Amino acid sequence: MFPKTVKVGAHKYKVIYPYYFIEDNELMGSSYQFDGTLKIAKLSFDGTERAKDLIKETFLHELIHATCDIYERIEISRSDDNETIVKRLSTGWFQVLKDNDLLLDKKHEMPKSVKIGGFKWKIQYPYVFRDLTSSAMQVDYHHLTIRIGCAIETGLQASNSFTKHCLINAILKCICDSLDISKIGDDNRILSSLSEGFCQVFMDNKIQKIIRG
């Protein structure tokens, strides 16, 4: 169900599944940067097998913990509301990755729309902004539209990795706003840092294929 290892930034985590939390049978997963492990439970606290999607969501939850540890340790991982933030992020991202094909493995391709929560967002790509350095992505809440830049008027083309990051950035912004994660959604620095992390983790480890498989 899961790969043996996942790459988060420069770190490689070993995925241990199924793992049995003998010390605490109510624990469903754990992420430790120190020993580089993600541990995922197959059984619930009563000894019965958990639903497949719940196991996958736990994997994603712990992977998000690892991503926050590497890309935004001070503001997120060490905050008092860390677990609440990560739970909302994993809930939001699981739905997005499950319900949409984000075409992360297709160069210079974008989905025409993406369902985020109960809303269907239109994606305008390729979109030409006047200046990509000041505006490469735009989230239009009034028209449920995400615009992603591909070039500027001078003809300079955006790279594939740049446009994929813009897509992840826009979706993360929408998730944070819909699930009230203001600590990320209202801070462009944290938003950009974490979206960079999610883009790397999702693409390098083919996470969407795991969630949808």
Which residues does each predicted region cover?
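Extended, structured, electrostatic nucleic-acid-contact surfaces
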Residues: 161
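Metalloprotease/metallohydrolase-associated module, dominated by Zn2+-dependent proteases
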Residues: 1-53, 70-158, 178-213
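Active-site recognition of the HExxH zinc-binding catalytic motif
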Residues: 57-69, 164-177
